[in-house]
Amino acid sequence: AALAPLAAKELKELVLSVNIFDDIKNLCDKGNSFAKDIMESWSMGEWFTNKPTVPESIKSVVYKVSGESNTDDFSPAQHAFTRADIPLHANIMGGVLFPSGPKEIKDLEDKFKLPVTFVGDVVGTGSSRKSACNSLLWHIGEDIPFVPNKRRGGVILGQTIAPIFFNTAEDSGALPI
């Protein structure tokens, strides 16, 4: 019972979870005030509306990759067995197109003390979208409090961004433009 207020607060901040919706609804129907608060919060979309607003301007340093960077450049298929370990898998991001990318991004962060914006001509074509976003955000994103080995945020600029990669980047908490 002592954890109920903390659990309710955290559940309100999650995107509606179909895995636990029925459990929360049943508790709500039985008069549980915490479950009622969660249901109301989900119905109002507070998991989204309570997020910080996008700032008027973003100061960052640019890491530019010319040409087409596809999902295999961000998440090489031959290393698919490491995808579950995001920090490890992110180390091999860049593949043949920009093999020193992770080091160059880190060097830019260290030199300018600014977040790095990834810029490409064509970004995110291919099929390994989520692992590609995970790898890229590991290098340009920010830690998610209390969620180990996962990051969100970061700006991705592209003359063309593959539509499904664009959506996946948004869903991952990035700002694709």
Task: Write out the residue ranges for each language-model feature.
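Fe-S-dependent hydro-lyases/dehydratases of central metabolism
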Residues: A4-P5, K9-I177
